[in-house]
């Protein structure tokens, strides 16, 4: 059985990959997303790499910049 830390690491990595895919679909560099979202390019790099436990406020800024919407947590 996997521990909590490895599960969270995998979720951060998957979220980062999703953000990267949306950004590149827009044809944007990381710096462009950072500027539009009002965060640093270093944060974008860390988030996309799955190395940053991003908070909901930053996620909301990124989603807004990408024209996406954050969804509520739903039970499967």
Model-assigned labels for residue ranges:
Residues 57-72:
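DNA major-groove recognition helix of helix-turn-helix/homeodomain DNA-binding modules
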């Amino acid at each position: 059985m996997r521990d909590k830390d490895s599960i969270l690491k995998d979720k951060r990595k998957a979220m980062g990959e999703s953000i990267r895919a949306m950004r590149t679909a827009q044809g944007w560099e990381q710096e462009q997303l950072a500027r539009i979202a009002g965060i640093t390019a270093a944060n974008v790099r860390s988030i996309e790499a799955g190395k940053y436990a991003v908070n909901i406020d930053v996620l909301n800024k990124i989603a807004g910049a990408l024209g996406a919407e954050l969804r509520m947590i739903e039970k499967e």
